Amino acid sequence: MQKRSNLKVVISLIALVKSMLLIMLGAIILGVIGYLAAIFLTVIAGEIMIKVIKHETFTSLLYLLIACGILRGFLRYGEQWCNHFIAFKLLAMIRDIVFAKLRKLAPAKLDGKDQGNLVAMITSDVELLEVFYAHTISPVMIALIVSIIMIIYIGYYHFALGLLASTAYLFIGVIIPLIVGKKSGNMGLNYRNDYGKYTSYVLESVHGLRIIDQFSRGNKRLKEIDKKSELLNEQNKELKDLEGQYRMIGDICVSLFSLAMFILGYYLYRQGSIEFNGVLISTIALMASFGPVLALSSLAHNLVITFASGNRVLDLLAEEPQVETVINGYQGNLGTIEINNLSFKYEAETILDKINLSID
């Protein structure tokens, strides 16, 4: 199996999105506006609270608050519809490409001992690519655009506040996912490969059930299946534990950066650089705007498995057929057929060893 970098896998998968670029652009626009509506729900509520304390009117802000709340639902629906439309259309396209490739590789590929691995690849590996197409491409762009807008908004109160916000977004949305990817290493690929081997083993057991029963090997076979299943469960548990750890780290970072924003804002207020309104609004804005970058942080774990699945599918598509199909037939004089040093063996048993043959 060829081990590609995650970047190469991403480029290969993104190449399929070209035909749906407009829908992807629509998902990004709807997502950005939707997240801004959700963020400013909290920010406007903070503004209203300040107006109440100062005994000032806030009717226009209340209307804006209601509008943001209503729009958020429609915008979120539109974004998800676009993302999943792209995902399921592309999954159908990928399945069509995979089955076309299997027809070229048949019968040699389908007659091998890794039939279960093929089943896992055609079904669950392709399904896992849905995470990439529906929950990766547009969320990355949405997080980038929303973060830039919020850095400008928070930085409007003071440059230092904007700098702290950019540090927070960068740490949670970029550094943590990179650490997750490095920490997980080949865990995702190993899990998907072992899952394919497990599926092959189970299918072989079903196909050879009569022989297994004939030689009274049923109990041993079941124990081996249990052993492989437990190994898969342990690998999955390691991945889930890693996900939980970094999700906890992300939540802690949100709290720490929000606290740091308030402390820095209060310090600037004591220095006379900003008003106290700026302290409250900048803190509220930061706390409310972590949604897009937290989504990226959580996504990093899922992408470990998704990239592994993408790598396996790309391996299949890159495989060359062992025998080329002759479409129009072949007419001609074959002459003498010669076989030189022909060998054939299974993993543990040699059948033919350097056979030489000449047929006139």
Where do the PLM segments sit?
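Membrane-integrated ABC transporters
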Residues: 1-37, 54-60, 79-83, 87, ...
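Alpha-helical segments in transporter systems
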Residues: 22-43, 47, 61, 65, ...
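Transmembrane helices of ABC transporter permease
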Residues: 19, 23-36, 68, 135-190, ...
